[in-house]
Protein backbone atom coordinates (compact mmCIF):
# COMPACT_ATOMS: atom_id res chain seq x y z
CA UNK A 1 0.00 0.00 0.00
CA UNK A 2 2.86 2.39 0.78
CA UNK A 3 4.33 1.85 -2.69
CA UNK A 4 1.17 3.26 -4.29
CA UNK A 5 1.11 6.40 -2.15
CA UNK A 6 4.20 8.02 -3.67
CA UNK A 7 3.14 7.67 -7.35
CA UNK A 8 -0.39 8.77 -6.45
CA UNK A 9 0.92 11.82 -4.60
CA UNK A 10 3.20 12.73 -7.53
CA UNK A 11 0.29 12.38 -9.98
CA UNK A 12 -1.94 14.61 -7.85
CA UNK A 13 0.74 17.30 -7.56
CA UNK A 14 1.33 17.26 -11.33
CA UNK A 15 -2.42 17.48 -11.96
CA UNK A 16 -2.73 20.46 -9.60
CA UNK A 17 0.13 22.26 -11.37
CA UNK A 18 -1.37 21.53 -14.80
CA UNK A 19 -4.78 22.87 -13.76
CA UNK A 20 -3.32 26.11 -12.39
CA UNK A 21 -1.18 26.87 -15.43
CA UNK A 22 -3.96 26.16 -17.96
CA UNK A 23 -6.10 28.94 -16.49
CA UNK A 24 -3.64 31.72 -17.33
CA UNK A 25 -4.95 34.86 -19.02
CA UNK A 26 -3.99 36.08 -22.46
CA UNK A 27 -0.50 37.45 -23.01
CA UNK A 28 0.24 40.55 -25.03
CA UNK A 29 2.25 43.71 -25.32
CA UNK A 30 -0.68 45.96 -24.44
CA UNK A 31 -2.10 46.00 -20.94
CA UNK A 32 -5.54 46.45 -22.48
CA UNK A 33 -5.23 43.09 -24.23
CA UNK A 34 -4.98 41.25 -20.92
CA UNK A 35 -8.04 42.84 -19.27
CA UNK A 36 -11.23 40.80 -19.28
CA UNK A 37 -14.59 41.66 -17.73
CA UNK A 38 -15.83 39.36 -14.98
CA UNK A 39 -19.11 41.24 -14.58
CA UNK A 40 -20.85 44.27 -16.07
CA UNK A 41 -22.15 47.47 -14.53
CA UNK A 42 -25.87 47.00 -13.88
CA UNK A 43 -27.07 50.56 -14.48
CA UNK A 44 -26.41 53.16 -17.20
CA UNK A 45 -23.47 55.46 -16.63
CA UNK A 46 -23.96 59.14 -17.54
CA UNK A 47 -21.83 60.11 -20.53
CA UNK A 48 -20.42 63.13 -18.69
CA UNK A 49 -18.61 60.71 -16.36
CA UNK A 50 -16.85 58.77 -19.14
CA UNK A 51 -13.82 60.18 -20.95
CA UNK A 52 -12.78 57.20 -23.08
CA UNK A 53 -13.19 53.46 -23.62
CA UNK A 54 -11.49 50.37 -25.02
CA UNK A 55 -12.64 46.91 -26.01
CA UNK A 56 -11.55 43.84 -24.09
CA UNK A 57 -9.50 41.17 -25.82
CA UNK A 58 -11.24 38.73 -28.16
CA UNK A 59 -9.72 35.93 -26.11
CA UNK A 60 -11.89 36.91 -23.11
CA UNK A 61 -14.83 34.65 -22.27
CA UNK A 62 -17.29 37.55 -22.12
CA UNK A 63 -17.31 40.41 -24.62
CA UNK A 64 -16.81 43.73 -22.90
CA UNK A 65 -16.14 47.42 -23.15
CA UNK A 66 -14.04 49.07 -20.46
CA UNK A 67 -15.29 52.58 -19.77
CA UNK A 68 -12.69 54.91 -18.28
CA UNK A 69 -14.24 57.57 -16.09
CA UNK A 70 -13.04 61.13 -15.55
CA UNK A 71 -11.68 59.88 -12.19
CA UNK A 72 -9.65 57.18 -14.03
CA UNK A 73 -11.77 54.26 -12.87
CA UNK A 74 -12.19 51.29 -15.21
CA UNK A 75 -15.76 50.02 -15.43
CA UNK A 76 -16.85 47.03 -17.51
CA UNK A 77 -19.99 47.39 -19.60
CA UNK A 78 -21.97 44.98 -21.78
CA UNK A 79 -21.52 46.06 -25.41
CA UNK A 80 -24.92 44.58 -26.30
CA UNK A 81 -26.80 47.04 -24.07
CA UNK A 82 -28.50 49.93 -25.88
CA UNK A 83 -27.14 52.56 -23.48
CA UNK A 84 -23.59 51.28 -24.02
CA UNK A 85 -23.98 51.43 -27.82
CA UNK A 86 -25.23 55.02 -27.58
CA UNK A 87 -22.37 55.99 -25.27
CA UNK A 88 -19.75 54.45 -27.58
CA UNK A 89 -21.26 56.27 -30.55
CA UNK A 90 -21.13 59.54 -28.62
CA UNK A 91 -17.48 58.98 -27.62
CA UNK A 92 -16.35 57.93 -31.11
From Swiss-Prot:
Pfam families: IL8. Disulfide bonds join 36-60, 37-76. One of its GO terms (biological process) is inflammatory response. Expressed by activated splenic B-lymphocytes and dendritic cells. Low expression in lung, thymocytes, lymph node, and unstimulated splenic cells. The keyword Cell membrane does not apply. SUPFAM superfamilies: Interleukin 8-like chemokines (SSF54117). GO terms for molecular function: chemokine activity. It comes from the Eukaryota. Residues 1-24 form the signal peptide. PROSITE patterns: SMALL_CYTOKINES_CC. It is found in: Secreted. GO terms for cellular component: extracellular space. Keywords: Chemotaxis, Cytokine, Disulfide bond, Inflammatory response, Secreted, Signal. Chemotactic for activated T-lymphocytes. May play an important role in the collaboration of dendritic cells and B-lymphocytes with T-cells in immune responses. Belongs to the intercrine beta (chemokine CC) family. PANTHER family: C-C MOTIF CHEMOKINE 22 (PTHR12015:SF102), SMALL INDUCIBLE CYTOKINE A (PTHR12015). This is C-C motif chemokine 22. It comes from Mus musculus.
Amino acid sequence: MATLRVPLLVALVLLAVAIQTSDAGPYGANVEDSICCQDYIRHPLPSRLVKEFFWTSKSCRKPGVVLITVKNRDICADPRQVWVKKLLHKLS
